[in-house]
């Protein structure tokens, strides 16, 4: 993220769900999922953010 968008940070908004905010079969209940965004919350970056996550092995 820092190489793609200088000054923008990765934000983890949720990793483990205890409150039941996700679908019943969500991997959040097993601690195997994460919700992420960027510090500037620019939705136009989300497609590239997903590609970067896949390239990093997530």
UniProtKB/Swiss-Prot annotation:
The C-terminal domain displays an autoproteolysis activity and a cholesterol transferase activity. Both activities result in the cleavage of the full-length protein and covalent attachment of a cholesterol moiety to the C-terminal of the newly generated N-terminal fragment (N-product). This covalent modification appears to play an essential role in restricting the spatial distribution of the protein activity to the cell surface. The N-product is the active species in both local and long-range signaling, whereas the C-product has no signaling activity. One of its GO terms (biological process) is proteolysis. Keywords: Autocatalytic cleavage, Calcium, Cell membrane, Developmental protein, Hydrolase, Membrane, Metal-binding, Protease, Secreted, Zinc. Zn(2+) binds at residues 28, 35. The keyword Cell inner membrane does not apply. Ca(2+) 1 binds at residues 13-14. GO terms for cellular component: extracellular space; plasma membrane. Belongs to the hedgehog family. The gene is dhh. This is Desert hedgehog protein. Intercellular signal essential for a variety of patterning events during development. The desert hedgehog protein N-product binds calcium and zinc ions; this stabilizes the protein fold and is essential for protein-protein interactions mediated by this domain.
